[in-house]
Amino acid sequence: LHQAGTDGINISLDTMDPEKYRKITGENCVEKVKRALICCADKEQFQVKINCVLLDQEWEELSELIELTRTHRISVRFIEQMPIGHGTVEQSWTEERIKEQLKAEGKTLKAVSEKLGNGPAYYIQIKGYKGTIGFISAMSHKFCDKCNRVRLTADGFLKPCLQYGKGTDLLKLLRTKASDEEIRREIEDCIYKKPHSHHMEDRKSGGIETENMAEIGG
C-alpha cells in the first residue's frame, strides 16, 4: 500500500465485539481487522483513523476502541448518528457523555492543537496515550459553517447537504449530452445553493432525506 502511494487509511469499525461485528458486517473477522489496523498504525508511513458511528453500544465497546490509542498512533473518531433514512434511532452516546465518562475514570484529557486532515473532526488526547480521540458531532455541535463537502450519489445526484433531498441530477445532464460548460455551471449553482445549516434536530423542518446512508454514499 505504501509503495502505491497510500499514506492514510480509514476503517469503519463500530464495535470489536465479535458477535455484534458479525451482525453488522456479515463477516466473522474482527480480530483480523484489528491485527491489520494495528500493523498499519505501527508503521510511521500511515495515518490510521477508525470511524465509529455512535449507536447503542455498551461503554465497554467504546472503551475497547479508545484503548487502542494507548499504545498505537491511531485516531478513533466517534461520529454522531444523523436522523437520515434508518438513522432515526435515539442514540445513547454523545461527545460530551464520552468525555465525562473518561474523566470519571480519572483520565486527563487535552485538546489536540495539531490540524489532522481537512474534515470537521475535533480531537482530544488522553494524557500518556500515543493516539487521539476525534469527534464528528453533527447533532450536538453543528459545524455547518465550516462544511466543505458535497456528495455525489451512485446514481449521479449531487447533494450539497446530507439532510435534504434537494440537489442536481448530473446523470440526467450527461445523458442529455449537456456540454462541459453547462455541467460546470450546474455544479457551481448547486454549491452556491448549499444551505447555511441543517435542521436535523427539528423533525418538522421538512425536506428530510429518506434514503439510507448506504444509498447516498460517502
Regions found by a protein language model. Give the residues of each.
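Auxiliary Fe-S-binding modules of radical SAM enzymes
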Residues: 71, 81-84, 88-218
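Radical SAM/AdoMet-radical enzyme domain recognition
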Residues: 1-79
